[in-house]
Curated annotation (Swiss-Prot):
GO process terms (BP): L-histidine biosynthetic process
Pfam families on file: Aminotran_1_2
UniProt family annotation: Belongs to the class-II pyridoxal-phosphate-dependent aminotransferase family. Histidinol-phosphate aminotransferase subfamily.
Known cofactor(s): pyridoxal 5'-phosphate
Subunit: Homodimer.
Name by which UniProt lists this protein: Histidinol-phosphate aminotransferase
Domain of life: Bacteria
A GO molecular-function annotation: pyridoxal phosphate binding
Keyword Transferase: yes
Length: 361
């Protein structure tokens, strides 16, 4: 490439994103517990909608996503005019950075927050500002102290990935109230459905003009392979985001499958209950053999080892047993492994394999 052809500032500072591994060399049918996927997959009703969609693949999809937006609004008690749909919640995050950040502005997030916050900030030439957490949990005072007149966006995953920790409504309200006037608080609720009774920021959005939530169909809805997400916020902000959203950013298949998925809340409830049961079981089983974790409110636990060497050695042992988990050194947690909560058999396999590893040490 010619030296005269250069990308925009910040682009070359982006490290390539590495997703969870899917395969282990020499191991057939390895169990993937590295990407926080729903082990039960999507709702049967969503699968039926997916199959029906093949009959209209020659037609362009809806440009306003009305069917999906209204379904989301009905289920969550929202105003459909203030819902925006995208290619995963990642795209909503990208829209927010494109619309409100840029050169000479700051995008704030916590030190163990989702990697896409930094990537999206750098992609628009903004300055990423990483704020320390307290014991792997969001520190509201630290975030407020990091805000300046340059701050435009504050991203907060609640529950957080990869830690699984979360803060309560009072802290969220204090954070929203304490931000500079020009800043937007973005509450990333990718794992919100795993928390009973949690509104993921809906009440705050109705009370204030500086809060937006993002959500995804990739986790509890089991549609990670389709890439569908959505956002909700003040109408003025959503109108801005729609101006940069591509008119056909979601296919008919994505829209119809996601609509069927969100309407099947019985499936969601079953998945949430099963996840909670086996998340508690696995955390307790690992704690008994000297592998602690913080209380997780998501569909994974962050297992802590004595040091990086032990975590990496355990990961290698798990791979020999056909178990794929996620190293999280990229999140500044090299002594930890993130383990997706699978079904009962999966959780028992993980506990047995880690116990086997600890006995060999």
């Amino acid at each position: 490439m010619s030296d005269a052809i250069r990308p925009q500032p910040g682009i070359l500072d982006i490290a390539l994103y590495e997703g969870g591994k899917s395969h282990v060399a020499g191991i057939q049918n390895a169990l993937k517990l590295s990407s926080n996927e729903n082990p039960f997959g999507p709702s049967p009703k969503a699968k039926e909608a997916f199959l029906r969609s093949v009959h209209t693949l020659h037609r362009y999809p809806s440009t306003d996503h009305a069917g999906l937006r209204h379904a989301i609004a009905e289920v969550h008690g929202l105003d459909p005019a203030r819902v925006i749909c995208g290619v995963g919640s990642d795209e909503i995050i990208t829209f927010l950075c494109q619309a409100y950040a840029g050169p000479h502005t700051d995008v704030v997030f916590t030190e163990h927050g989702f990697l896409m916050y930094r990537i999206s900030a750098l992609a628009v030439g903004a300055n990423p500002v990483e704020v320390p957490e307290r014991e792997r949990t969001t520190d509201v005072d630290a975030i407020l102290a990091a805000c300046t007149p340059h701050t435009r966006l504050v991203f907060l995953a609640n529950p957080n990935n990869p830690t699984g920790t979360m803060i309560g409504q009072a802290d969220l309200a204090r954070l929203a109230a304490g931000l500079p006037a020009q800043a937007i608080l973005v509450l990333d609720g990718a794992y919100a459905e795993y928390v009973p009774g949690y509104d993921a920021g809906r009440a705050l959005i109705e009370e204030r003009g500086n809060v937006v939530m993002t959500r995804t169909f990739s986790k509890i809805y089991g549609l990670g392979g389709l890439r569908v997400g959505w956002g909700y916020g003040p109408k003025a902000i959503i109108d801005v985001l729609n101006r940069i959203r591509g008119p056909f950013n979601l296919s008919t298949t994505q829209l119809e499958t996601a609509e069927a998925a969100v309407r099947d809340q019985d499936h969601v409830a079953r998945c949430r209950a099963d996840n909670a049961r086996w998340r508690i079981w696995l955390a307790e089983a690992l704690a008994e053999i000297g592998v602690p974790s913080d209380t997780s409110m998501a569909n994974f636990i962050l297992a802590r080892f004595s040091d990086t060497e032990e975590a990496e050695a355990c990961d290698l042992h798990l791979q020999t047993q056909g178990l794929i988990v996620r190293r999280v050194a990229g999140y500044k947690l090299p002594h930890c492994l993130r383990i997706t909560i699978g079904d009962e058999a999966s959780c028992r396999r993980v506990a047995h394999a880690i116990g086997q590893f600890k006995r060999m040490r």
